[in-house]
């Protein structure tokens, strides 16, 4: 691919975002247990990075070693840069864990007891716990010609044990493997009277390493070390060749745990020859090995804040607000009839969305409900409401995206339950994931003495997931606007039926009109600038990668358009480059909540067009997904979106990171006045 304009590398951008997440763990303004949580989040993000992005890069290197990445670098060069940066990030994680977080936790009476410091009473308690709770479920595997190296599951905790001596059959023991079942707790609370601390804990790895000899009787344990293998987690389902996507996925899901190895994690003290054996057995190189100065899976430390009753070391809980127009009304339909409703999560509650669906399920005047589901969780009151509606005789149609990564099994289960109660379940369009967030309710109403059907719609930037609605920032719109409702109806027609593209009045839809409409809007701002008029673009999203949109932004900036981009994660556009992008700023907001809404603002000669969307500016969202962008037409609500979703974050000087012209980020520091957008919005809505 020839590159006309510069692009920053995607993989390095993802690692850069995780560096910003990890920086939260070093921020003294963040409560201590939340700082630990940010370390765990970084670890979880890295797991997914290796399972998906690094796995894909390694596949590309094998299949087409001479290819270039979209930024123009060779794949080998990208791989080398990614490995170097990932190694540094992992080292920084463990340094921060030991030098900053664990030290501070001990000062607060929260302590991890290492085996080297156990006294006699603690050792006896640990021994009893091992024999009572662990030994019955552990299966040691001795390695010999009859017991080859096991194919360990993706991201499972394992121990490699060096042994000396002969077993009961006279075999010379060399090495064994112990796999820790996922059901075993990774953190075990030590009784306070033994610990000496209000909250004392022992890691599962400490217990296993101390007593692993009990699994190999009469043999000498020379070493015992943790290891963990990360595997390629992409599912290989050829949608063109299968007749039933759900059945095909159910057959493919178990293989995810046994994909090609991508990364080996070992404890820092693992002997070199043991590491070599693990790499050889996994088919990995030295560069694919990451040394952990602590637990190899930091994600499991996420349990600690829930196990410790110390509210002073956590974020102050917030109670999302209920908008007055909703709180003061019995019927959600009456509320929407009086005007559009805008919800700003997590500052405002997700409950009105659920209440709308619950009322629709029970309302005898409701005849049909249509809903998209991408992620909703394993215990979803929203799905219960849909099933209740189907039982009550409503025409319920649910577009369930079975290929939502890492939620496939959950969505398959929901699809089965929905079908069992009589709902129509479809899986979208082959080759295009349904990522749009839409709910459509059709209801009989009386107008002028006549009965007619009226549509009500909810559109959102985030998932129909009550739990993440308390953790992610998103906007949702409830409306009975005739044109928007008709557009949503047409999109559902395309998802459930077969036919030509239907013309939409208000919505921009991928894979048809979203990309060209966006390009058209950017070009219109450029024309305003060339004519000497005010021109402005402000856009907020999770990721910006699509090359043609980036090229349009560069050209608009050169025409004089002032462009402010708020991109939480990876951004391939390079701001502040002389002669190219001096008029563009890029900032990333990393704070208590995960920034998730997508907002597109165009000054448009003073008309101020504002769109909300489920779509990031990426190839997949424009061309390989079903997405919608919807306008905010109500003037009051438009001012809210601009103020709460854009201006507040442009003024943030506590959680904002500004991208420099070389692609690196620098944290914005408060001057005389400190401004934190998320905390300000919490104060506004939740005080």
From Swiss-Prot:
Enzyme class, spelled out: transferase
Write out the catalytic residues in the record. Answer: 435
**What GO biological process terms does the UniProt entry carry, in alphabetical order?**
polyphosphate biosynthetic process
Q: Which GO terms describe its molecular function?
A: ATP binding; metal ion binding; polyphosphate kinase activity
**Which EC numbers characterise this protein's activity in its record?**
2.7.4.1
Names of the cofactor(s): Mg(2+)
Q: Which key words are in the record? A: ATP-binding, Kinase, Magnesium, Metal-binding, Nucleotide-binding, Phosphoprotein, Transferase
Residue positions binding Mg(2+): 375, 405
Record's InterPro entries?
Answer: PP_kinase, PP_kinase_C_1, PP_kinase_middle, PP_kinase_middle_dom_sf, PPK_C_dom2, PPK_N_dom, PPK_N_dom_sf
Its post-translational modification remark reads: An intermediate of this reaction is the autophosphorylated ppk in which a phosphate is covalently linked to a histidine residue through a N-P bond.
Residues the entry annotates as binding ATP = 45, 472, 568, 596
**Reaction equation(s) it catalyzes:** [phosphate](n) + ATP = [phosphate](n+1) + ADP
GO cellular component terms attached to this protein's record: polyphosphate kinase complex
The protein's job, in short, is: Catalyzes the reversible transfer of the terminal phosphate of ATP to form a long-chain polyphosphate (polyP).
Q: Write out the similarity annotation.
A: Belongs to the polyphosphate kinase 1 (PPK1) family.
Q: What is this protein called?
A: Polyphosphate kinase
Organism of origin is Paraburkholderia phytofirmans (strain DSM 17436 / LMG 22146 / PsJN) (Burkholderia phytofirmans)
